């Protein structure tokens, strides 16, 4: 921890707790990547409100968007108190600017080629100039870590600031045993995957990063795994994959990818999964939930995704149900909740793979008891808002799905004029879609009262669709 650059400002508040310390913590950048990974598009600084001196941040280059392979920028810091963030745009003038998600309500000030905004709590933000979403600035303002593991503890794997290569050169991974805490100090850069295979009681913590691994973190045949705070930059495949595991918690994770098959968080035959406060910008599905795939078997249930930001440069922000087990034909995806989610982008030119909120079941899967609530869709470049389908996809499936039922969409808003019609389609009379509730749906500021206004293409084998104007408790 002594390698972190810590800048502290102490101030007094008239409170019974006495003195409160406000801090800004920035991380060293390893010399091996200092020049190679820098992006000169922006100069970013931060300071405590009321202070004179600014703290310079390192501007990382991150690749985004498989179609364009664009260079975007990322900065990170930890803080408490209230801080100002100053951004200088180094290439061209500022004609307009926006800080997203819009739900955060951050209104920046613009002065020439400078932009200023203030935050008083942790945030994951996109700063976009002149409508440019591909060469934008990502600002990750983390909470300060209070309980750092003891590096001398035999059950702690501690990665200090610097570049770390795995000793497993064949698999290019760091294998984590049971009952272990892995800590990535700020400024730690791992050039390999973290693998949790057939283990239990593992914690992966800290504000370090995984840089261009084959995949980010793999959790297979395991239980009770916590991932909190890390950043995964441009993995070749998944950011986090889960297979036949239970008790997975993911918090404050940040992810970028730009290649095909580089999904964000994918879970196959997993249960009891909690995802909270993540930022995923991926060039494949941001979050995908399946049952059987490869060597993983069983249902997918009790999944919660909360308070997060999803940005699908390619494919779906949310995709449920594609892969399953036609041999047994009895696997289920159920008791799934997505709540308080900002979707910043959905762009997919293939109609079969469109949908911000997609339940597309194949392989004899049944999807039921799924809720999407408080979802804000800011932009759809090409795609659909809703996609509910029972399908036999010849490319990925060995049989059709069994059905989709008991699905609730509540408090959904979307802005965008040129969006493809949403789709609801069953397969046959025994493999249908039923009992779908749309409650308080707002498109471009207008509250929806009918399927026609909702712009849904309702096809065969669909039953019991309801549209409610106002919230009513179940």
What are the language-model segments listed below?
Residues 11-21:
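Hydrophobic h-region of N-terminal signal peptides that target proteins for export
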Residues 179-181, 186, 200-210, 223-234, ...:
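Right-handed parallel beta-helix
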